Amino acid sequence: MPEGHVIHRLARALDAQFGGETVQVSSPQGRFADSAALVDGHTLVTAQAWGKHLFVDFDAPVAEHLLHIHLGLIGKLGLAPLAAPVGVVRLRISDGEVAADLRGPQICRLVTEADREQVVARLGPDPIREDADPERAWQRIHRSAKPIASLLMDQQVSAGVGNIYRAEVLFRQHIKPSCPGNTLRRASFDAIWQDLVVLMRDGVEVGRIDTVTPEHSPEATGRTAREDAHGGEVYVYRRADLPCLVCGHRVRSALLEGRNLYWCGTCQRRH
């Protein structure tokens, strides 16, 4: 599932290409045709991301003028020069030159302002957004006995954080993944949050997740650069049984609530 920085990049791309423009909205697949017709031929006002949720605002004179998208595990949204649709395209937004095609989303629906407010109200603060309030995340974390590794993946705690950012921020802050939220020190939470802000906003800018500091980079250490579909240089994510880039001990992995968790038992001992 794409992490939050991907959704923010998509919002930026839609704004840059279509913002303020009259667009054609269609459903080549046909499944979204009735809803697409309601906003077809209207101006795309803006696109915004909250965590892993994308909302696209049209100036159509209907209550349900907001397009709500959640890509889920397999969904994809991409912009390309206008051409005949390829594959199963649920939704297409086009200005006649460029098309944004949506395939396989978990959510694709038109909603009202009130609907959007309900969705956003259920989400925790998004580290990428300027209006994020980390205190809301702290209040949920320090009242819970669940492991911090579980809590960070809870979208009601921190919106947009996924498996990669979860593993990497805990490593970078030396936090034991099994540390219960109600024993995590406030200083540790503050460090986690600030690091998420830096890492995730950097992900928006560069389009990939890079978490390794210069002294541990391939250039500095002479090691082979990472080759992975997710791009980016990371410390522990998908590095199970390989030596830790800092201490040399084996990176560990385990299933936690159905997702693979990666950590270094030597480097990550703090609470």
Regions found by a protein language model. Name each.
Residues 1-271:
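Structured catalytic/nucleic-acid-binding cores of DNA maintenance enzymes
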